[in-house]
């Protein structure tokens, strides 16, 4: 799949809207000492160019929660012909990065519903606090994804949808999924990886410590506070 030309960078307004949505998301911090986050990714051929960036993003997510408490992350990805893989739960960014570097992208159809269904099964075993999905395409039934997203909403598990590229059809469904689950949506491309890292770090902090931790995180240094103020304009 060829990469679309002239992809728009993520705008300040869009990033600000995303952070505002995160702040509105109900916090599920209860007695669990460690928040659990399912991190789903599209590993089909079209995402090969940006896969390496995902490793850096994972590392930053873990560092962002150092002062709050650990998070446990499970990596799930699909690729090729009906291949769907999940890692074990890990609180080590290095372990997940090592696993991700051993993954090569392969052409195939999207399997987003499998990630959603798997996350719901994990939740039935032990509560998860959020699901993150990063992808650029949608080749399955949008109504089914929205139905599953509604289940996440019932269980109060927000889905944070990150879209690479500018497909309007993908954007429409990703936004609906985020809305139905009580989560949030944000687009990105190769020119806005830094912003994506910051947003995913914010999600990780939210999972680890809730709204108060997120607010403190955004004000933890002047550079981050300035960025946040710019995003909310």
Language-model features and meaning:
Residues 1-38, 45-52, 67-69:
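Acidic, polar low-complexity linker/tail segments
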Residues 155, 173, 180-181:
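Short, structured coil segments at secondary-structure junctions
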Residues 181, 185-233:
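C-terminal "exit" segments of structured domains
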Residues 61-64, 147-155:
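Catalytic-core regions built around general acid/base machinery
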Residues 32-88, 92-134, 138-143, 165-175:
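Von Willebrand factor
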Residues 39-44, 128-140, 163-165, 182:
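DG-centered beta-turn motif at the end of beta-strands
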Residues 129-130, 154-160:
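Short, surface-exposed connector motifs at secondary-structure boundaries
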């Amino acid at each position: 799949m060829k990469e679309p030309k002239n992809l728009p960078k993520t705008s300040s307004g869009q990033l600000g809207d995303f952070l505002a949505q995160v702040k509105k998301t109900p916090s599920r911090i209860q007695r669990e000492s460690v928040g659990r986050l399912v991190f789903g990714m599209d590993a089909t051929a079209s995402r090969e160019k940006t896969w390496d960036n995902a490793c850096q993003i994972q590392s930053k997510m873990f560092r962002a929660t150092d002062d709050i408490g650990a998070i446990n992350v499970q990596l799930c990805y699909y690729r090729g012909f009906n291949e769907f893989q999940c890692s074990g739960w890990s609180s080590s960014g290095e372990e997940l990065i090592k696993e991700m570097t051993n993954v090569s992208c392969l052409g195939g159809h999207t399997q987003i519903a499998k990630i959603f269904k798997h996350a719901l099964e994990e939740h039935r075993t032990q509560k998860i606090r959020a699901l993150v999905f990063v992808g650029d395409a949608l080749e399955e039934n949008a109504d089914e994804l929205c139905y599953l997203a509604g289940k996440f909403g019932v269980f109060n598990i927000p889905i944070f949808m990150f879209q690479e590229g500018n497909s309007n059809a993908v954007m429409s469904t990703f936004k609906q999924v985020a809305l139905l689950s009580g989560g949030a949506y944000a687009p990105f491309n190769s020119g806005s990886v830094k912003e994506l890292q910051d947003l995913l770090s914010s999600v990780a902090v939210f999972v680890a410590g809730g709204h108060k931790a997120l607010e403190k995180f955004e004000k933890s240094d002047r550079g981050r506070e300035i960025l946040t103020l710019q995003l909310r304009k």
